[in-house]
Design a protein with these regions (language model features):
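Double-stranded RNA-binding/processing signature
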Residues: 1-283
Length: 283
């Protein structure tokens, strides 16, 4: 009788598991001395600032079906248990309030449109990322190897901007644990000092790149209504979507379209193109 082996049906055509390798030897835990340098005072709750440095790509997670996590090299830190997204949300609200109050006092009488436009320029992630670089935060951003090598790593201003917002929330909670009544004021003073040290307000006002705001003003003046935006197309998997957004003419037709990896960027570019097409800006 033949005893030749046959392949198990369950293994025939089985896909090789994908190897997930988040390990990044460039990651470093921020020292207490660096936190104190950035804050200009000693921190009480160091863990908050360290969490503010963690991008979601370097957080421990369950491996997806058919995926294995590669062993951690000796020169890499362990995955973190929490990222900075919750802190970023809180910091975003705190920063909006501080900057809004500051601009109203710095430029009295300019009006809501001017303040809103300038605040938008100051607190957008690209600009905040530039401030984070000037503060020396970039070396302490913790991220996956993929984000480091493929997504611009420590030069990625959007990630650094999110880190700065999370840092502001960490500072607020650190101070609030010690003295809740003065916590906001202390954070406010720090933010204002950063702005007045590192921002050229004259240049920022002269180089307004908030095209959505510019288009809003142009539409209100010309058509007496705000512009409307429409999602024209969405492509790609959930984790890597590409959006095409359109600006609608008051008659309902699509005036211009633009494509980007998030809706806000696509709307900004579509707004810029609409300003040119309608003759409100030079190409």
């Amino acid at each position: 009788m033949s005893t030749s082996a046959t392949a198990s049906p369950s293994l025939v055509g089985a896909a090789e598991p994908k190897i997930y390798n988040p390990w990044n030897p460039a990651n470093k835990e921020i020292p207490v001395a660096e936190i104190a340098r950035i804050n200009r005072c000693e921190p009480k709750r160091v863990e908050l600032y360290r969490q503010a440095c963690v991008h979601k790509s370097f957080v421990a997670r369950e491996a997806h079906e058919g995926q294995l996590i590669s062993p951690r090299p000796d020169d890499c830190m362990s995955l973190k248990h929490a990222d900075n997204e919750h802190l970023e949300f809180v910091g975003d609200g705190i920063l909006d309030a501080i900057v809004g109050d500051y601009l109203e006092r710095r430029y009295p009488g300019e009006g809501e449109g001017f303040w809103t436009s300038l605040r938008s320029d100051l607190v957008n992630n690209e600009h905040l990322g530039g401030l984070a670089m000037k503060l020396g935060m970039a070396p302490w951003l913790i991220m996956s190897r993929h984000m480091e090598e493929v997504c611009a790593g420590r030069s990625n201003r959007r990630m650094l901007g999110s880190m700065l917002e999370a840092w502001i929330a960490a500072m607020y909670r650190d101070r609030a644990a010690d003295d809740p009544k003065t916590a906001f004021w202390r954070v406010q003073q720090w933010v204002i000092e950063v702005l007045e040290t590192h921002v050229d307000f004259g240049e920022l006002i002269a180089c307004n790149t908030n095209y959505k705001d510019q288009l809003l003003r142009a539409f209100q003046a010309t058509f007496h209504q705000p512009p409307r935006y429409k999602e024209v197309a969405t492509e790609g998997p959930l984790h890597n979507r590409i959006f095409t957004m359109g600006v609608l003419h008051p008659d309902g037709s699509v005036l211009t379209t633009a494509t980007a990896r998030n809706k806000k960027e696509a709307e900004q570019e579509a707004s810029r193109l609409a300003l040119i097409r309608l003759g409100f800006a030079a190409s």
